[in-house]
Amino acid sequence: MDYIKGFTYGWMARKGDFLKPEAKESLRLLQERTGTTHVIFALAALQDTPQSTSIDYTGQHIVDDEELIDMIHYARSLGFKTILKPTVNVKDGTWRAHINFFDLDVPCEPKWRDWFASYTEYQEHYAVIAQATGCEMYIAGCEMVQTERRADEWRQCLAKIREHYHGPVTYNTDKYQEGNVSWWDAVDVISSSGYYPLGDWDNQLDRIEKIIAPFNKPFFFAEAGCPSRTGSSQIPNDWNLEGDVNLKEQADFYMDMFDKTSRRQWVQGFGLWDWRHLLHEEADAVNNDDYSVYGKPAEKIIKEFYIK
């Protein structure tokens, strides 16, 4: 597998957003300013609550097929390799890791089989698009921790995806959960979210290496990043953490992550989090405390690492 010098793009894009000239300019700037070679198009379908069994991927909350296909073609015209990553959010704000149902079916209660039927239909829809547009990889969702114990349903879902998409397939498990997935044999690439504290990377890499070694499959961090906020380098997954804007702390996180992972040949890339399809003004970077690296010191650190 080629080393993935990747960035997640377009997260939470709504219908019509990819039609805006600013969205294509953002994608061009991603390449120019970071040296990124792989762009991950992350899509967010919606379900009403963690116990809802119907997934909506056709509303105003998500780009439509035509604009997605057009943007993938545009990315490829720029020379990007493309990865499609459809996942799901919960409309009431609950994190998708808490999507959950009874292990044994109970009459009149929502059931795993109904949720997986809807989720698999959703995945099949985008697997067709990934195949038609020549995407180099397909990520069958991310960080759905409670679902991961349902190995049989996940195997069936992945098998249905493969009926439509014939390239490498992965699933993006959450930080610290690499050992929770018993069905890594059913994917081509193992991936997880690399939101690990600055200073703890060696410990986490030692742990992950022992878990994935028996599977003998490529591995990359399908997500990794850190807000530019005081305290975020110690809990980079917490997007709600309160703290002052701190561009240096974000830069230090990236330097540490790249330094430690570059010493492990089995780490074969990143899908950094994240590059917005509608960028803030570059002059506003000094006041921006989220995951964006646009116009911040971390942006230069990423480019130096990606182009070497």
Q: Where are the regions a protein language model picked out?
A:
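The substrate-binding groove and active-site-proximal loops of carbohydrate-active enzymes
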Residues: 10-17, 52-65, 105-120, 141-148, ...
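Aromatic- and glycine-enriched glycan-recognition loops and surfaces
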Residues: 16-31, 56-77, 121
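Substrate-binding cleft and catalytic face of glycoside hydrolase catalytic domains
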Residues: 36-52, 66-147, 276-278
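Active-site clefts of carbohydrate-active enzymes
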Residues: 194-195, 214-252, 272-289
